[in-house]
Amino acid sequence: MCIRDSIKILVHDLGAAKMAEMVEAEWAQIKDSVLALDQATIDAIERQFAPPVYEALPDDSTAVEQLRRADFTFARWLTANVAPHKQPGHAIVTLSLKPVGGAPGDATAEQMDAVADLADAYSLGEIRVSHAQNLVLPNVKRKDLPELYQKLVALGLATANIGLVSDIIACPGLDYCALANARSIPVAQLITERFADLARVHDIGDLKIKISGCINACGHHHVGHIGILGVDKNGEEFYQITLGGSEASDAALGTILGPAVPYGEVVDVVEGLVETYVALRHKGERFLDTYRRVGMAPFKERIYAAA
C-alpha cells in the first residue's frame, strides 16, 4: 500500500478535523527546526547523483536518418519512443511494455535479462522505470539507435505507442488486489486489442487512458484523458468513466461521463469516445484539447443516447 492510500485510510478512520489537528501539531514541533548536515555528508550525497561521463558527439546521425527514410516502422518508433536528450548526440529511449493484448507493465524474466544487457551496451549501465509502467534507457547515443531498435524488435519491446491510446496505465485490479472492486488488466488488454492497428493509434494521437480497480486510484484514473474506475454493483463489475483529466502542467481531475457501464461494454464505450473525438477534432488537436473545446455533451450523447 502506498503512502497516499495510507493517508486516505487515516482520514477515513480519524475524520478530517482530527487528521488536520494531528498534522498541525506535528508541524508546530518541526517548523522552526533546521536539518543540519555536515559538508562531508552533503558531498557524499552529491556524488550519488553525479551525471555520467558522456562522449562528445554530433547531434546528427547519418545512419539514423538513412534508416528513418527507408523504414517507416523505424520512423514511427523514432517519433513515439525516442525523446531528445540535453547532451548532444544522445537520446532517451522508452521501451514499451504495452504490446497488443499484454498486461500493462509486464515483462518476462528473459526480457529483463536482455534489457539489463542492453543498458550496459547502450545506456551507460542505467535503466529507469517510468510511472507509466514502461522502461527507459536514458543515455543512448543517437548513432546506436538503429542497432538498438533491431534488438528491441527481436525482444518484443519496440511497440511504437508511447503516450498513445494503447499505452495504458492500469493497476493490478481484482485479479491480484484484495482492495479492488473490479478487474483492470483484462480491460486494458481488450482495449489494446481493439486498437491494435498502429496506423490508427498514431492517427488518434496523444491520448492517455488510465484504469483503477477501486477508489484508491493506483492507476491514476482521475487524471486520465479517459479515466476508468472499477466499482461494485451488487457483486457485478461496473466501470465509471471520466473525461478530461490531466497530470501535466495543465493538471485537472476528470469529470464523470455518466452512469457506470458493465464490464462487457467498456471497450465499446472507449471506442465510441475516441471516434467522437476524431469526428470533432480540429487539425492538430489532441483528445484533451477537443474535449475542453466542445465539452462533455457530444461524448455523453454518443454513449448514452441509444440507452
Name what the model sees in each region:
Residues 4-307:
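Peripheral terminal and linker regions in Fe-S/redox and tRNA-modifying enzymes
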